[in-house]
Structures are given as C-alpha cells and as structure tokens.
From Swiss-Prot:
Gene: SDHD
Metabolic or biological pathway: Carbohydrate metabolism; tricarboxylic acid cycle
GO biological process, one term: regulation of catecholamine secretion
Entry GO MF terms: electron transfer activity; heme binding; metal ion binding; succinate dehydrogenase (quinone) activity; ubiquinone binding
Residue spans, topological domain Mitochondrial matrix: 57-63, 112-122
Name the record gives this protein: Succinate dehydrogenase [ubiquinone] cytochrome b small subunit, mitochondrial
Mitochondrial intermembrane side: 86-90, 145-159
Amino acid sequence: MAVLWRLSAVCGALGGRALLLRTPVVRPAHISAFLQDRPIPEWCGVQHIHLSPSHHSGSKAASLHWTSERVVSVLLLGLLPAAYLNPCSAMDYSLAAALTLHGHWGLGQVVTDYVHGDALQKAAKAGLLALSALTFAGLCYFNYHDVGICKAVAMLWKL
C-alpha cells in the first residue's frame, strides 16, 4: 500500500527534520530504535495519505494466470534453441502450442487495454479465441501434413 507523507506549512524546520528522521531510509539504527515508540505529533501536520485502496480478491486465478504467462515465456526461451538443435515432431507440436498460447495471451492483453465497451470487448475476445484456435489448428495441420515448423524454418534459413 502506497503511503505518502505530507508536511503542512504549519511545520517549521524542526518538523521537516523530524520527518526525515522518521523515514526508514534516512535514519540510522540508533535513532531508529529511539523513535519506534514515540507517537507522531499531530500538531506538526504530518498526515497519512493512502493512494490505492486494498482490493483483495478471494481467488488466485489472476496470480496463477500471470505465473503461467511467465512460465510459457521462459519455456519458449529454452524451446527455440532446443528445436534448432533437435528438430522432431515433438518439438514441432510443442512450438505450435507454446507460440499459440503466448500469442493468445499477448493479444488478449492488447484487447483488454485498448478495446472499450462491453459488447465490443466481448466480440474482440471471441474473435481472438477463434483466431487462436485456427492458428493452433493450422500449425498442427502443417506439422502433420508437411515438413513441420522446425524444418520449415531451416528451409527458410537456407534461402
């Protein structure tokens, strides 16, 4: 929770100095122990200002989603060199799944940030879901009926 300290115009130099000594970054350890139990003088005009209210949801869905996005990103960092060193169908399908999921989550954040209005946002998310499903199906079709993602990239590099 962000807390700011505001010093009103009523305080003089002593009030400003006392505020600096109360800041954990500035005060030495021996002063810190001395000031722990002393109350803040109300006449000095020091106030707590709470910038953001604490909204805690009961589910861990957002945290798990954020963690899984980072896991897929790190997985891609290892999967790309592994696919170059060992091109096989397992790598092709793993790349198809990871790239599609990574793109879906990334474009989903773009839709969330830049598409406004409930109906328009629902339509954009439905379109994104359809696009992601078609992308995954197309990559799986390409892996099964053609050379696969790894060999296709290698053929492009030979050009």
